[in-house]
UniProtKB/Swiss-Prot annotation:
Name of the molecule in the record: Thaumatin-like pathogenesis-related protein 4
SMART domains per record: THN
Keywords linked to the UniProt accession: Antimicrobial, Fungicide, Pathogenesis-related protein, Plant defense, Signal
Organism: Avena sativa (Oat)
Signal peptide: 1-21
SUPFAM superfamilies: Osmotin, thaumatin-like protein
Length: 169
């Protein structure tokens, strides 16, 4: 007969397996440097043309956002960007100036994701889920994106999916 600690361990193992992190692979295909930002995890960094940034986002992350900043100049972690700036910081902790947004919530029965240009369009972006639809936003009229808060543009993926964001696809 199993002990209570064995049963507890097995339950925790099952729960942990069902609520694992999602991997976000962010690629810059633009002919110029992009400084992606990510909240609430990730912060931000410089991505030269052809470079990739991989983020592990824990289950239970709600209202996550990733966006591309352009025309940036940083020195020692502070500076400014022409688009998508977040208070002059290289590593963002809050959203900043309006930009094309990849939005997501991870965990629960399903993951949810979308592209938003409600505030502004600043950069072409594809956002895809390993078990769902590939969203494309190539210009300000992109049909896959939210343009108004009540647009029905949220998509769902199976929990434990991984994601790909490509700037200038």
């Amino acid at each position: 007969m199993a002990t209570s600690s064995t049963v507890l361990f097995l339950l925790l193992a099952v729960f942990a397996a069902s609520a694992s992190a999602a991997t976000f692979t962010i690629t810059n295909n633009c002919g110029y440097t992009v400084w992606p930002a990510a909240i609430p995890v990730g912060g931000g960094q410089q991505l030269d043309q052809g470079q990739t940034w991989t983020l592990n986002v824990p289950a239970g992350t709600n209202s996550g956002r990733i966006w591309g900043r352009t025309g940036c100049s940083f020195n020692g972690g502070s500076g400014s960007c022409q688009t998508g700036d977040c208070a002059g910081a290289l590593s963002c902790t809050l959203s900043g100036q309006p930009a094309t947004l990849a939005e997501f919530s991870i965990g629960g029965e399903h993951d949810y994701y979308d592209i938003s240009v409600i505030d502004v369009y600043n950069l072409a972006m594809d956002f895809s889920c390993s078990t769902g639809d590939a969203l494309q936003c190539r210009d300000s009229s992109c049909p896959d994106a939210y343009h108004q808060p009540d647009d029905p543009k949220t998509h769902s993926c199976n929990t434990n999916s991984n994601y790909q964001i490509t700037f200038c696809p």
